[in-house]
């Protein structure tokens, strides 16, 4: 790695960290973060190392944060859950449309709900 590449990495870190408040978790997906790193003229291994380093430094992971589901939607999901704790793919898609969520969000919500119920019974 030459001096210019190290300077580019330093600048990338400053750019990424300037978007955080008091070194807190980034609340938006890491798109900006990846965009800056991908624009650097360094080898893929160095990009991945930089991605991990900055991620650890700012407390983020390379995935999107969970979304908050409003009370009305939670109530609807809870009603469905009371009837049936495991949904088929078709049922999951139907519930997702009704709740304005993705089928994946519904699947994860149901999985988390089952775990929460299991833990409260213990």
Curated annotation (Swiss-Prot):
Signal peptide: none annotated. Residues 62-121 bind DNA. It comes from the Eukaryota. It holds the Pfam family Homeodomain. GO terms for cellular component: nucleus. It is found in: Nucleus. SUPFAM superfamilies: Homeodomain-like. Its main location: nucleus. The keyword Plastid does not apply. Keywords: DNA-binding, Homeobox, Nucleus, Repressor, Transcription, Transcription regulation. One of its GO terms (molecular function) is DNA binding. Belongs to the MATA1 family. Forms a heterodimer with ALPHA2. There are three genetic loci for mating type genes in K.delphensis. MAT is the expression locus that determines the mating type of the cell, whereas HML (containing HMLALPHA1 and HMLALPHA2) and HMR (containing HMRA1) represent silenced repositories of mating type information. The mating type is determined by the MAT locus, which contains either a copy of HML or of HMR. Diploid cells are usually heterozygous for the MAT locus. Mating type proteins are sequence specific DNA-binding proteins that act as master switches in yeast differentiation by controlling gene expression in a cell type-specific fashion. Transcriptional corepressor that acts in conjunction with ALPHA2 to repress transcription of haploid-specific genes and of MATALPHA1. This is Mating-type protein A1. It comes from Nakaseomyces delphensis.
């Amino acid at each position: 790695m030459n001096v210019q590449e190290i300077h580019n990495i330093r600048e990338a870190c400053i750019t990424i960290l300037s978007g955080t408040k008091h070194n807190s978790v980034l609340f938006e997906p890491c798109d900006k973060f990846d965009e800056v790193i991908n624009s650097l003229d360094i080898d893929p291994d160095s990009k991945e190392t930089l991605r991990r380093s900055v991620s650890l430094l700012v407390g983020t992971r390379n995935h999107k944060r969970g979304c908050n589901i409003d009370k009305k939607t939670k109530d609807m999901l809870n009603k469905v859950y009371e009837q049936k704790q495991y949904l088929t793919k078709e049922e999951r898609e139907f519930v997702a449309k009704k709740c304005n969520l993705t089928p994946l969000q519904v699947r994860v919500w149901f999985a988390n709900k089952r775990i929460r119920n299991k833990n409260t019974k213990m």
